[in-house]
Amino acid sequence: ELLISYDFHNPITQTNTYFDTENQDVKKQHGAVRIRTIQNKKIFTLKIRKDEYTHYEFEKEISAENINEIEDPEISNWFNQYQIPKNLHPTASFTTLRNVYAFENGELCLDKTYYKNHTDYEIEYEYTSDHDGIHFFNSILEKYGLKWVKNCPSKIARALND
């Protein structure tokens, strides 16, 4: 019902590969290092936990095929600033079919994600600017008898447990 209520355009297929050290140094900081591939475009992402509900997210398009081939000074600065080691290796990978509807301050995302051993569905609201996103997201969900509660593991956690 939610999918047909908004003018979602062509779904996007994206593959996410997450990286960490053998000692899970990134995970210990409640962070994530990811390369997202959409068609031939690769986007590097560093997420660092700000508080219980929010992460800082740094993104930059890259041309490197492998995490260890990235030689971008800005990305190196993020790694140094947040003490992210450079000896990273892939820890999980999955593909998501994402439908996106843009609002003024964020995007409503309906995801169907294919993991190694299962498929799941998720509704997300991703901020594009600072605002009371939780309240706004719940106002959308209310119309369908739903309410957002932090009740499920993240996609990376689900992939690691797959």
Model regions: which residues?
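Phosphate-end processing signature that detects enzymes handling 5′-triphosphorylated RNA
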Residues: 1-162
